[in-house]
Amino acid sequence: MTVDPVLAINQNLGIAEMMDYVGQLQDEMIEHRRDLHAHPELLYDVVRTSGKVAELLEEWGITVRRNVGKHFGMGVVGLLQGLAGNGSTLLLRADMDALPIREGNELPYKSVNDGIMHACGHDAHTAMLLGAARTLAAFRERLSGTVIFVFQPAEEGAVKSPRDGRLLSGGRDLIEDSVLEGVDYAYALHVMPELPVGTLGIHPHYAMAASSHFKVGFQGTSGHHSAPHQAVDAIQMAARYIGEINGMMANRIDPQEAAVLAFGTLQAGTAINVIAEHSELTGTFRAFTKRTVAAITNGLQRHASAIAESYGGKYKLELREGITVVNNAEAVQQVLHAALAVLGEDQVILLEQPSLAGEDFGWYLEKVPGAFAFIGCGNKEKGIVHAIHQPQFNIDEAMLVHGARILVRLAIQHNGSASGKQK
């Protein structure tokens, strides 16, 4: 693995002292993570979580901006100005929201909110960034430039804006409220149980796919099964649509480009002997290039229109396009250097295959250079093997220190100074 030698850090910066400080915060980070895990909140409804985060940042002397987000106002942003002079502005992001999943783990800190669970590690992401924020605040005399700590709601989905009706995830909501103003680089870490604790994986270019959601409604006319010629069957329109879209994915999308589409729900009908007048399909599709996303989007529209016309019905298509997470080459080098220093060379992996899962950190990386990396949280010996979004998902909490140390090193690599002492 080749790492740019110009990223080498002079040891007189006291990096070892800062790494030790992070280690001393291990129990505190575990406590924060478990508290958040026990009290998960969904999407933009992160009142308790955001309040806790803001209070801690303020306690550590970090300037806090609450209620961030042009449309929903549930984000928290911490601003730390280094005291060693001017430098670049670095953004470090963690997501705060949980998932509508009933937890399957029997833990002392099991979710108290039935049907809601931190099954994607956002509790860990928040705890790691809190640890990094406290450390950098304690050593701000050694820091030049600015570090922005972004705690984001609603990574797991989009909600219709009360302002303009658009479907917005938390990343877009915060970006529209100027969180990227003046930012030079942006970074985020995400837990990955497929990687053992003590490791980090990163893709050199594409990290995650653009994950887009769609909903198609077909409107026909109801009628009795004895007289199908007097009705327009919305179930038949939906069934034909499923077949045609699957055919489109097999025959009209470039097989050299990774793409996948799947239907998730189909709702139709009210009685066993009545032709359904309405049907509704939902699903997702995932791809990496704008060309493929456009091809699928156009196909969804074209086939819905043609089917509705051929049956004499109507249709409505709603679409929320995702965005690909594209890592910047220089930022990847920064992550590699930080991870190698924290974990060791054998523990850092250049991932060959990008993930077809989605992540709205792509909206950040569309605007500014940066990188998105995966930090190992699995431990087979402890039975921590379940994938994200599963009821039995868990993490080896030793990864919290690893992640916080990597985030701290990223800040120092961009904005380190040899002067100053711990506050």
Q: How would you label these PLM feature ranges?
A:
Residues 3-10, 236-423:
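Metal-dependent amide/peptide-bond hydrolase catalytic core
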Residues 4-118, 127-145:
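Acidic/His- and Gly-rich active-site-bordering loop/insert found
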Residues 36, 92, 122, 149, ...:
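Divalent metal-coordination and catalytic microenvironments
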Residues 37-39, 44, 118, 122-125, ...:
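Histidine-centered active-site/metal-ligand motif
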Residues 74, 105-117, 123-124, 136, ...:
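Histidine/acidic-residue-rich, glycine-tolerant segments that coordinate divalent metal ions
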Residues 91-93, 214-217, 372-377:
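Non-cysteine beta-strand/loop elements that form the S-adenosyl-L-methionine
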Residues 94-99, 192, 209, 266-269, ...:
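Short glycine-enriched loops at secondary-structure junctions
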